[in-house]
Amino acid sequence: MERPDKAALNALQPPEFRNESSLASTLKTLLFFTALMITVPIGLYFTTKSYIFEGALGMSNRDSYFYAAIVAVVAVHVVLALFVYVAWNEGSRQWREGKQD
């Protein structure tokens, strides 16, 4: 059996990422917004249904389901918009830092 030389091994190495800290930052952002996407709409649904629509406004059970669902859908869209905004700014910041090098 032949032993591969070092030049051949170096050619097979995977490409290096720009920065390990940028990967960690991106992963933290993604996990943060994933947690928000799960907790905020569900929490707002039950909170607004029980305390606002049925409690404060005195709506029926059927009506409170409907309006609480609307609040949850709006919350999902707000979280998605915030994620897109943060991801867009993070990407442009990393691009500017890479361009200055």
UniProtKB/Swiss-Prot annotation:
<feature type="topological domain" description="Lumenal">
    <location>
        <begin position="47"/>
        <end position="65"/>
    </location>
</feature>
<comment type="subunit">
    <text>Associates with the V0 complex of the vacuolar ATPase (V-ATPase). Interacts with ATP6AP2.</text>
</comment>
<dbReference type="GO" id="GO:0005764">
    <property type="term" value="C:lysosome"/>
</dbReference>
<protein>
    <recommendedName>
        <fullName>Vacuolar ATPase assembly integral membrane protein VMA21</fullName>
    </recommendedName>
</protein>
<comment type="similarity">
    <text>Belongs to the VMA21 family.</text>
</comment>
<dbReference type="GO" id="GO:0043462">
    <property type="term" value="P:regulation of ATP-dependent activity"/>
</dbReference>
<feature type="transmembrane region" description="Helical">
    <location>
        <begin position="66"/>
        <end position="86"/>
    </location>
</feature>
<keyword id="KW-0968">Cytoplasmic vesicle</keyword>
<dbReference type="GO" id="GO:0012507">
    <property type="term" value="C:ER to Golgi transport vesicle membrane"/>
</dbReference>
<dbReference type="GO" id="GO:0070072">
    <property type="term" value="P:vacuolar proton-transporting V-type ATPase complex assembly"/>
</dbReference>
<feature type="topological domain" description="Cytoplasmic">
    <location>
        <begin position="87"/>
        <end position="101"/>
    </location>
</feature>
<dbReference type="Pfam" id="PF09446">
    <property type="entry name" value="VMA21"/>
</dbReference>
<dbReference type="InterPro" id="IPR019013">
    <property type="entry name" value="Vma21"/>
</dbReference>
<keyword id="KW-0256">Endoplasmic reticulum</keyword>
<keyword id="KW-1133">Transmembrane helix</keyword>
<keyword id="KW-0472">Membrane</keyword>
<comment type="function">
    <text>Required for the assembly of the V0 complex of the vacuolar ATPase (V-ATPase) in the endoplasmic reticulum.</text>
</comment>
<dbReference type="GO" id="GO:0005789">
    <property type="term" value="C:endoplasmic reticulum membrane"/>
</dbReference>
<feature type="transmembrane region" description="Helical">
    <location>
        <begin position="26"/>
        <end position="46"/>
    </location>
</feature>
<keyword id="KW-0812">Transmembrane</keyword>
<feature type="topological domain" description="Cytoplasmic">
    <location>
        <begin position="1"/>
        <end position="25"/>
    </location>
</feature>
<dbReference type="GO" id="GO:0033116">
    <property type="term" value="C:endoplasmic reticulum-Golgi intermediate compartment membrane"/>
</dbReference>
